[in-house]
């Protein structure tokens, strides 16, 4: 079973969906994330088995959305795919 997941989000305009890449070691996960980042993708490393939770993403103008993600980094990537203005992230427990 993999120990890490690399979540990747394609750059705007790419005809691709975000997806997870399983990795068995941290060094491999870092290499995978860096390889995608070098091509303009956003990427973050997540411990395997981390559950999805709701995160609240807010803009300075007060607009907010809920994002289902495993980590704050993943929530940030997902919310900023909607708008770069989201700059405040808080877990909704």
Regions found by a protein language model. Give the residues of each.
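A short, charged, amphipathic alpha-helix used as a generic interaction element across diverse proteins
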Residues: 23-47, 68-90
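Short aromatic-glycine-(Arg/Gly/Cys) micro-motifs in beta-strand/loop hairpins
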Residues: 1-18, 46-64
């Amino acid at each position: 079973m993999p120990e890490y997941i690399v979540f990747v989000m394609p750059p705007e305009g790419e005809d691709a969906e975000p997806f997870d890449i399983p990795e068995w070691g941290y060094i491999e996960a870092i290499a995978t994330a860096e390889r995608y980042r070098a091509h303009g993708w956003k990427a973050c490393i997540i411990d395997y088995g981390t559950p999805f939770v709701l995160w609240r993403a807010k803009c300075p103008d007060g607009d907010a959305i809920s994002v289902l993600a495993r980590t704050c980094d993943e929530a940030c990537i997902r919310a900023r795919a909607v708008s770069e203005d989201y700059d405040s992230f808080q877990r909704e427990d």
